[in-house]
């Protein structure tokens, strides 16, 4: 029995990395959209769990923050808002598709959606890298020393209306300050229109300035700055002040744990982008994707088998999570678990050549049988003189 076990273990491998998102224990959390929004099922004409890419048994575990039609990026910048909030040691993201080239958003008629896709990459890169160091995520409003009775109505379309940042004239008579308080770290937007000017956030406590210059953008070009609690003054060399109104709040620092990101894309009939894979980089992020087109069972954009398989890893714990995938066991494997965390395999074996062409084996058996018959015939002749 031991020989049979070793044969199959070495020849077939019982501990290959799985293309799933998973967790080491029950201390995990998922941020998503309609494909993991269990509450949205009740709004369908027929209550059909085939709409989801997650298993229905995950719906009531309190470890999912998802909203149909939303994304963290969309909620961050626009009036269409869902307060994504959650906490866990191992964080999984499966959202982002609800702001894509399919929506063709741009601030002006002659603006550029490409600029907004670049903004999306920068945003998620900052989100993923920060979330590898913190347990808790939510949205907060940014407080100011006065109310904005006069503001420019800029950057609206028939799809979305921008409200983070907003804009006021630099001729406004008062200095503009904002205060960040209560979170360990904030992700704040700093956005500029095409022009030869710059803008800064100046920390009144430390004297440190966070700046951004804009020379080439054909739309609203944004960078995303991680700020600590404090009082900040905004000043600009342009004609308008870009005023942030919302920030992502990171709290409860943790030991570094890479986030896991599942690609969020449409069926090929709609335009998607590669923002999430561009943003999800080592060492702070593992990216999981399906090899095929997204083809849903409920409709073409909901209930794909490939992504359902990737999300099925949330149903069980694994021993190790790495760049190559998740490992069920911590014994050994044929693929070394690079950039890993958890109880990971400590050795990689060489897979033996256990598969043969059956035809040569059959011929060898026939020849061996004939050789045995010949030997028996010779022994018979010798025995009988």
Curated annotation (Swiss-Prot):
Annotated compartments: Virion membrane; Host cell membrane
Cellular component terms (Gene Ontology): host cell plasma membrane; membrane; viral envelope; virion membrane
Signal peptide interval: 1-11
InterPro entries, per the entry: Capsid_hemagglutn (IPR008980), HEMA (IPR042545), Hemagglutn-estrase_core (IPR007142), Hemagglutn-estrase_hemagglutn (IPR003860)
Region listing for Esterase domain 1, in residue ranges: 1-121
One of the record's GO molecular function terms: sialate 4-O-acetylesterase activity
Subunit description: Homodimer; disulfide-linked. Forms a complex with the M protein in the pre-Golgi. Associates then with S-M complex to form a ternary complex S-M-HE.
Cited function: Structural protein that makes short spikes at the surface of the virus. Contains receptor binding and receptor-destroying activities. Mediates de-O-acetylation of N-acetyl-4-O-acetylneuraminic acid, which is probably the receptor determinant recognized by the virus on the surface of erythrocytes and susceptible cells. This receptor-destroying activity is important for virus release as it probably helps preventing self-aggregation and ensures the efficient spread of the progeny virus from cell to cell.
Protein name (database record): Hemagglutinin-esterase
